[in-house]
Regions:
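C-terminal accessory/tail domains of diverse enzymes
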Residues: 1-244
Length: 244
């Protein structure tokens, strides 16, 4: 922060026109891949201005803010699941004992799906049977997408009639053979149905909880015809399971 203040003190940031990102702020910029890409641009600009920085110094911060849920690989296709950002809405006023309250809808979460070595003409990535709008990152065979889902169902939330979407089942589907090559599952809570009674005491316990909620099995059996991938023109990187 001090380096940025010093850099702008010497050379104020005075563009002719600020970029209007529109819905991209709630689409690709919520995914850790593009957050890190944007951060590396900032580090490069600081180095050009005479402030020696290395983006690898901040790799632990990336892992802490966007923890890895798990990965899966089959036939040279590597799939990685990682936490992403999800802004929560503040609801309207509701009656509460002794007055009124405004609850926060914390039931929604977002997960990043990143794939390497994917031939998009033949294979597709699905979440709960729905094909993901995988977008190229600019690297051959590398694609990324986000999944927005309801993790739990509190008494006060937007769209109260929409149920919980977990566990999330991800499949690597062969479109030609109409079958899943394999897949993985991610559970938001304990897969056995238990409720965590206390908060994790440190980062190691939190990581162990995440790892026990991820399984490298549990793909969809039988014939799968995923059909055509539907992409929202306003949110091309995001699959919102609430709209399915």
């Amino acid at each position: 922060m001090r380096a940025l203040i010093s850099r702008f003190w010497k050379t104020p940031y005075q563009p002719q026109r600020l970029a209007r990102w529109g819905t991209e702020l709630h689409d690709r910029f919520l995914l850790p891949h593009f957050v890190w890409q944007d951060f590396e641009d900032v580090v490069t600009e600081l180095n050009q201005a005479g402030y020696p920085f290395d983006s690898s110094w901040f790799a632990p911060h990336l892992e802490f803010r966007f923890p890895k849920y798990g990965d899966y690989a089959v036939r040279g296709i590597e799939l990685e699941l990682r936490a992403a950002l999800e802004p929560w809405h503040v609801l309207g006023e509701e009656g509460a004992p002794g007055g009124t309250a405004r609850y926060v809808d914390s039931s929604l979460e977002r997960i990043q799906v990143k794939v390497n070595g994917l031939p998009p003409d033949r294979y597709a990535i699905t979440c709960n049977g729905v094909p993901l709008p995988m977008q190229s990152t600019g690297t051959v065979g590398e694609f990324v997408a986000g999944v927005r889902y309801r993790a739990w169902q509190p008494p006060s939330a937007l769209h109260p009639t929409i149920g919980v979407h977990t566990p999330l089942i991800f499949d690597i589907v062969d479109r030609w053979m109409k079958r899943s090559l394999g897949g993985c599952q991610y559970h938001v809570m304990h897969p056995g149905g238990r409720h965590y009674e206390v908060f994790p005491v440190n980062a190691f316990e939190a990581e162990s909880r995440r790892l026990e909620r991820f399984f490298r099995f549990g793909h969809s059996p039988g014939e799968l015809d995923v059909g055509v991938t539907c992409t929202d023109p306003e949110f091309p990187f995001t699959l919102d399971l609430r709209k399915i």
